Amino acid sequence: MSTQPMPLSLTDAKPGQGEYRVRAGSEIRALLRRFADEELPITLATPDGVSYTTCLWADDPERAVLVLSADAADARVQRLIEAEEAVAVGYLDSVKIQFDLNGLMLVHGRDASALHAQFPREIYRFQRRDGFRVRPVGHACPELQLRVSGPTDTELTLRVLDLSHGGLALFLPDDQPALPVGTSVRAARLALDPLTQVQVALRVVHVAPLKESAHGSRLGCEIEGLSGVASRTLQRYIDQTQKRRRLLAVS
């Protein structure tokens, strides 16, 4: 799943991309509302290579402001607000969403800091070609079972928030051991349902705090190793989940 932006200045987009441009205020609000409601990760990027993953905490079209989570101690946050250009990139199901960030500033609150940006006037949508990310349907959510090495080895069972053939997102409760960016897990067990389990190797590529009421963080992980059987099993689960979502949308 690539979080690399298309050409950083959206006005420089290639001919033919205009059909993916969203300018209607109601459509822009609907897209951003999904990022906030589903607590989906958004990667902020600059032309000189700064990349920072965050979540949209609030969108306020009346005040024309976006509010994104931020760690004030992270040097990348300061580089973002000092940059002349910045772009936000995220995914909604099979579509890459991208928009320019203007007026980016760091705001300090009593309990947390946040990034504020101007509400976007337009958003670009790019159809993904490298697979689909799905969120579990129903109450039986997939889980990842892994062992964390340390002074005392710890067994963790983490809920899967969404997954694709190339990666997955996990919910890490605040009271569990941290899994920082770069952590590699060579032998984890992905339980797709009570009867279906596959072995995976993965690496943590970003960590983003969720809303305070969630009491945890979202871990974005790349899948680095799948056997042929495991790959087919995972693809079958993704296909079945997509079909179930379409049926629920129609009913």
From Swiss-Prot:
Superkingdom to which the source organism belongs: Bacteria
Gene Ontology CC terms, in alphabetical order: bacterial-type flagellum basal body
Primary location: other
Limits of the PilZ domain: 127-239
Compartments, as annotated in UniProt: Bacterial flagellum basal body
KW Hydrolase (keyword) present: no
Signal peptide span: none
Key words of the record: Bacterial flagellum, c-di-GMP, Nucleotide-binding
Cystine connections: none
Matches recorded under Pfam families: PilZ, PilZN
GO biological process: bacterial-type flagellum-dependent cell motility; regulation of bacterial-type flagellum-dependent cell motility by regulation of motor speed
Gene3D superfamilies recorded: Electron Transport, Fmn-binding Protein, Chain A, predicted glycosyltransferase like domains
Gene Ontology MF terms: cyclic-di-GMP binding
Family per record: Belongs to the YcgR family.
Functional note: Acts as a flagellar brake, regulating swimming and swarming in a bis-(3'-5') cyclic diguanylic acid (c-di-GMP)-dependent manner. Binds 1 c-di-GMP dimer per subunit. Increasing levels of c-di-GMP lead to decreased motility.
Subunit structure of this chain's protein: Monomer. Interacts with the flagellar basal bodies.
Record protein name field: Flagellar brake protein YcgR
Organism: Leptothrix cholodnii (strain ATCC 51168 / LMG 8142 / SP-6)
Gene: ycgR
